[in-house]
C-alpha cells in the first residue's frame, strides 16, 4: 500500500491521472489475487505472538548449497538450481521462509507470528515489507499474499546462526546429521510441489 499512497503525493485534484509503474502494477496484482479468493470473512487474531521457538519454525539457506525449513516435526530441504547463483544471501534466506508458509501456513492460520532469521538485512525487509531490490520485493509480495490468505500477521527478529543448528544442517544438505540431531522429527521430509520449487520462481 505504501507505493500506492506515495503516488498520490502532490496530486492536487481527484480527477488528475497518475501513471502506474511496473512495481505498482505488481502490487495491485497481489491484492487482486487475494480479493478474487477472499470470502469476506475473517477471524480475530490471537493477541499472543508465537515466536519461531514456540512454533518450532526455523529456516536457513546456504549460498553455495541449498535451503532447509522446519516446522514442528515437519521438515523440508533442497538444493539450489544453477540459476539461483545470487550474491545477495538475503534473497536465498527469504525463500525458505516464504516456502514454509506455503507448505504449512494452514496450521498457522489466524496467528501473529515472529519469524527468526540469522540475516539482519532480511529482518529489516520483512518488518518494513519493502525493499529497493526487485528480487526481495518479489518475495515480499509472496509473503504478504500467503499471510493475507491465512490471516497471519508477521514480523521478524534476528537470531544468531549458532542457535539455528537443525535448519543449518538441512541447508548444507547434511540430512544424516539433521536426523541424528532431531530424532523426534518425521522420518521423511515434506514434499515440495514443483510449482513451489526454486526453479519455478524466478524473482
What are these regions (language model features)?
Residues 50-63:
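Two-metal-ion RNase H-like nuclease active-site motif
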Residues 11, 27, 152, 169-203:
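Flexible, low-complexity interdomain linkers flanking nucleic-acid-processing modules
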Residues 71-95, 99, 103, 120-137:
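A short, polar/acidic, helix/strand-boundary loop motif
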Residues 4-5, 31, 58-60, 69, ...:
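Mobile genetic element proteins and their domesticated derivatives, centered on retroelements
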Residues 65, 70, 77-79, 106-117, ...:
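Primary recognition of RNase H-like, Mg2+-dependent phosphodiesterase/nuclease domains
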Residues 61-67, 123:
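Short acidic, Gly/Ser-rich segments with clustered Asp/Glu that frequently serve as metal-coordination loops
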Residues 102-166:
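RNase H catalytic domain
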Residues 1-48:
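C-terminal reverse transcriptase regions that engage the nucleic-acid substrate
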Amino acid at each position: 500500500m505504501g507505493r500506492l499512497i506515495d503516488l498520490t503525493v502532490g496530486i492536487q485534484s481527484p480527477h488528475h491521472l497518475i501513471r502506474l509503474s511496473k512495481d505498482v502494477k505488481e502490487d495491485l496484482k497481489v491484492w487482486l489475487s487475494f480479493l478474487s479468493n477472499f470470502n469476506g470473512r475473517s477471524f480475530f487474531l490471537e493477541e499472543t505472538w508465537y515466536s519461531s521457538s514456540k512454533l518450532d519454525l526455523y529456516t536457513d539457506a546456504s549460498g553455495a548449497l541449498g535451503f532447509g525449513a522446519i516446522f514442528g516435526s515437519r521438515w523440508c530441504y533442497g538444493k539450489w538450481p544453477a540459476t539461483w547463483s545470487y550474491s545477495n544471501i538475503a534473497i536465498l534466506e527469504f525463500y525458505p521462509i516464504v516456502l514454509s508458509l506455503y507448505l504449512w501456513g494452514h496450521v498457522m492460520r489466524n496467528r501473529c507470528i515472529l519469524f527468526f532469521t540469522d540475516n539482519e538485512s532480511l529482518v529489516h525487509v520483512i518488518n518494513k515489507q519493502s525493499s529497493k531490490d526487485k528480487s526481495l520485493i518479489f518475495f515480499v509480495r509472496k509473503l504478504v499474499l500467503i499471510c493475507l490468505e491465512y490471516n497471519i500477521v508477521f514480523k521478524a527478529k534476528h537470531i544468531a546462526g549458532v542457535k539455528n543448528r537443525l535448519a543449518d544442517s538441512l541447508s548444507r544438505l547434511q540430512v544424516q546429521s539433521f536426523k541424528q540431531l532431531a530424532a523426534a522429527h518425521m522420518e521423511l521430509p515434506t514434499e515440495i510441489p514443483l510449482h513451489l520449487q526454486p526453479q519455478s520462481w524466478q524473482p
